[in-house]
Swiss-Prot record:
CDD domains assigned: 3b-HSD-NSDHL-like_SDR_e (cd09813)
Enzyme class: oxidoreductase
Catalysed reaction equations from the record: 4beta-methylzymosterol-4alpha-carboxylate + NADP(+) = 3-dehydro-4-methylzymosterol + CO2 + NADPH
The protein, known as: Sterol-4-alpha-carboxylate 3-dehydrogenase erg26, decarboxylating
Active-site residue list: 144 (proton acceptor)
Annotated residues for binding of NAD(+): 148
Pathways involved: Steroid biosynthesis; zymosterol biosynthesis; zymosterol from lanosterol: step 4/6; Steroid metabolism; ergosterol biosynthesis
Biological classification of the source: Eukaryota, Fungi, Dikarya, Ascomycota, Taphrinomycotina
EC numbers on record: 1.1.1.170
Mode of membrane association: Peripheral membrane protein
Length: 340
């Protein structure tokens, strides 16, 4: 079996950046597995990796790829986006991850790196510089983070001498390829809603530039393959290491786009919760997924920042792109996308 073969599950936002960084290294066989071919990434990287398609909720699809490619390392980034039906998260994040673990064990994979979420420890209360000792709540705020917590648990419990595993809890990803965070903030600008603010904007938040998150996955892989795999069975918070007030990040995005709100109308958190509750009830009766929820209010009003000392010590992780430069690169990419 080739010694340096890496299979990336998911070729989207994070997976694509991991593949790009892997392609910068020498002596690697690289493959990606996704529901559909990422033709844009294949074209960009000129065939430097192999693309497999299939459904990770189907064990046969997974095993077919493992049998053909023989990965030494698997980096599992695949996950549905936010605001989908509950069943989808459990099918993909929980059942799909279980399928990947089984295939890793069956085909003698050496290392599995899993993309978890910093949100797995969030229950609506403030998270102030918390580290990996923070307990996972018994009751989660949403199905996405509940399913990610269960998948993370499976991955860590699968760690052994033969299959080394690690999970990375990434926080607030943004960057080129982002289809959620920054585009969502720019849609607020487009809709003329920048003057509205939930909460007092005294809550500190962690965001993570995508290239830093990708880099952390490669560091975890390197550690697990080393003669001293200190990351085995471990979980790590990954951020930019630069906290910022929640609404300041949004306003930095808007400022880079040439807009400064002329004034601010503040809605206290209790008012936001009341409005979100009403919106959820209306959508319940209309059988629609609500866009404005109590979870979003709590998310945007709470302190949510994390201590990355463990990642620095064990993985030797240090962000390679700072927050301001990350915002600049993201908006430059979005400008380029508009022209095509």
């Amino acid at each position: 079996m080739p010694m340096n073969s890496v299979l990336v599950i998911g070729s989207g936002f994070l997976g694509g950046h991991i593949i790009r960084q892997l392609c910068e290294r020498e002596n690697l066989r690289i493959a990606a597995f996704d529901l559909f071919e990422n033709e844009k990434l294949l074209h960009e990287l000129h065939g430097q990796f192999t693309m497999y398609t299939g459904d990770l909720t189907k064990q046969g699809d997974i095993e077919r790829v493992f049998e053909e490619f023989h990965p030494r390392v698997v980096i599992h980034t695949a996950s549905p986006v936010h605001n989908l039906a509950r069943d989808i998260y459990f099918e993909v994040n929980v059942d799909g991850t279980a399928n990947i673990i089984k295939a890793c064990q069956k085909f003698n994979v050496d290392a599995l790196v899993y993309t978890s979420s910093a949100g797995v420890v969030f229950n609506g209360a403030d998270l102030i510089n918390v580290d990996e000792s923070q307990p996972i709540p018994e009751v989660h705020m949403d199905a996405y983070n509940e399913s990610k917590a269960l998948a993370e648990k499976q991955v860590l419990e699968a760690s052994s001498e033969s299959l080394k595993t690690a999970a990375l809890r990434v926080a607030g990803l943004f960057g080129p390829g982002d289809r959620q965070l920054v585009p969502g903030m720019l849609s607020v600008l487009k809709n003329g809603q920048t003057k509205f603010q939930l909460g007092d904007n005294l809550n500190l938040f962690d965001f993570t530039y995508i290239e830093n998150a990708a880099y952390a996955h490669l560091l975890a892989m390197d550690n697990l393959l080393s003669s001293n795999p200190t990351a085995n069975g471990q979980v790590f918070f990954i951020t930019n290491g630069q906290v910022i007030y929640f609404w300041d990040f949004a306003r930095a995005i808007w400022a880079h786009a040439g807009h400064v709100p002329p004034y601010i109308i503040k809605f206290p958190r209790p008012v936001g919760m009341l409005l979100a509750t009403a919106a959820e009830w209306v959508c319940y009766f209309l059988k629609k997924e609500p866009g404005f929820t109590r979870f979003r209010v709590q998310f945007s009003c709470a302190n949510r920042y994390f201590n990355i000392q463990k990642a620095e010590d064990v993985l030797k992780y240090h962000p390679i792109v700072d927050l301001e430069e990350g915002i600049r690169r993201t908006l430059a990419w979005m400008d380029t996308e508009k022209k095509h």
